[in-house]
């Protein structure tokens, strides 16, 4: 394995995993053109709890994936989020590229997050950021970040072979979906 591959297993505490993913997020969330790449891989099992959720922010050049045969083999009680990027011109998701999420289940648990962030799992991306074989339960999946400086723009992505209840499209300009189940789509006109 390369030096930037992190493999987690259910015997690790949420605090141990959080320390690693938070350190990577601190480096990668705004590292748009940096050369670093990370893979955060989860062995089959359950991570986080309702009282101590695992919250993962996915930055540039970061892959988050479950290593089970099925998305239900890896369950994260918490969030796996992408938020708007803020700079002198405002807070938007138009350059949230180069990250991915695959082959796991997110049971949304929001203890410790503010009211707006607790409202759902955020995947505010704009292209080159696929979500494949992901189940989202216990809350909404939102494809825009309406918490950081109010609703702002995002510009598309790809979701395939996934199951989720309610999806908030919001300001997304375009999103390609394929073979998704139990999907209820809410536009944000």
Placement of each model-derived feature along the sequence:
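Predominantly polar beta-repeat domains that present long G/T/S/D/N-rich surfaces used to bind, process
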Residues: 3, 101, 131, 136, ...
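Surface-exposed or flexible loop/turn and strand-edge residues in extracellular/cell-surface modules
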Residues: 3, 37, 51-53, 59-61, ...
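N-terminal extracellular ligand-recognition/capping segment immediately after the signal peptide
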Residues: 10-63, 69-81
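Feature marks extracellular polysaccharide-active and adherence modules
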Residues: 43, 65-70, 77, 104-107, ...
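Sequence/structural signature of small/polar-enriched beta-strand/turn repeats
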Residues: 79-94, 101, 177-178
